[in-house]
């Protein structure tokens, strides 16, 4: 997965119709995923875990069965594309899209701020977007008002530098981050602990 730039194509929102194929325009085909097994909080929590080595071990009965059981969206790219595929007021396995992704469409759903497991669509804060001494990276909400600031806090120096170098050249592009957000103690500023490069994507 990593944090290599993901070339998402933003498309107008559509109403969620089971079995429809409009999602293929932004890389998300609803028919390729198991909506009923999707658990948003668990999926985002898994993104904070270190990457596991790929295993070629087959599950019993999978090989030669002629059918492949779809999995729920689980990478940041898949979940973000799914959210962009539908209207923010729609639901996916009973979860409101706008309560999974904060973007320009759903910001009205967050009058008091951003708390808990959420994906945010942000941009590099200007003029300064990081604090090397405190290992923090700052983003602003990629919304018309830009009223929220998001702080990515790092314990690992190497990971901090890696993400800083990803964010630095992409000041004009949306940066998508998944995390467990909490108040920073300052008005309209929210923070999270950044643990894995799977938690961030650049949208181009």
Model-derived segments and their meaning:
Residues 1-204:
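Intrinsically disordered, low-complexity linker/tail regions enriched in polar/charged residues
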